[in-house]
């Protein structure tokens, strides 16, 4: 299955994406808001989760490619992990290679993923969350017509320490 936009192709993540995922997750600027770069094993585990989520739930993060087949990153809706502070939910997220920033790709890809989540997957709500000091992601959330939902803001402990998430939700 492939989702297409005017400039992008979104496809299921696959084994062949391991090298590109590792490069994406190793970039310090890309990973600044996520506790820093991931090593290869951590990056591979993330890809494995996306592949497994698609097989189990029918939705997950999509690999993003330009029309020439160049890997730009990923975007899509994931089911929450069982122990998430917000309980069960579907969360949209994205991460792009550094040289893909500033071209509107995150908004374009996430918009296609949201449409798929509501139409094909029949989800009724999708949320997003980001750090308070990540205005780029907050701007994407606003362009996706998500609304701030401060009553659901949360804190969680991750490998990198305590993380405070600002929540946005679909209208």
Residue ranges and their predicted role:
Residues 1-33, 61-171:
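Acyl-donor (CoA/ACP) binding surface of acyl/acetyltransferases
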Residues 15-22, 40, 44-48, 55:
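An amphipathic alpha-helix signature
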Residues 51-63:
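A short helix-loop-beta-strand connector motif used in the catalytic cores of GNAT acetyltransferases and
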């Amino acid at each position: 299955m492939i989702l297409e936009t005017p400039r992008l192709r979104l496809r299921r993540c696959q084994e062949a994406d391991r090298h590109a995922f590792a490069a994406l997750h190793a970039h310090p600027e890309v990973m600044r808001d996520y506790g820093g770069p991931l090593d290869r094993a951590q990056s591979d585990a993330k890809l494995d989760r996306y592949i497994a989520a698609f097989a189990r739930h029918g939705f997950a993060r999509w690999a993003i490619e330009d029309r020439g087949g160049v890997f730009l990153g990923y975007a899509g809706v994931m089911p929450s992990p069982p122990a998430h502070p917000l309980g069960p939910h579907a969360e949209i997220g994205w991460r792009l290679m550094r040289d893909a920033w500033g071209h509107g790709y995150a908004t374009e890809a996430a918009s296609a993923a949201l449409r798929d989540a509501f139409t094909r997957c029949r989800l009724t709500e999708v949320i997003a969350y980001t750090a308070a000091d990540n205005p780029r992601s907050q701007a994407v959330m606003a362009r996706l017509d998500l609304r701030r939902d401060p009553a659901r803001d949360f804190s969680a402990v991750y490998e990198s320490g305590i993380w405070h998430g600002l929540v946005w939700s679909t209208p």
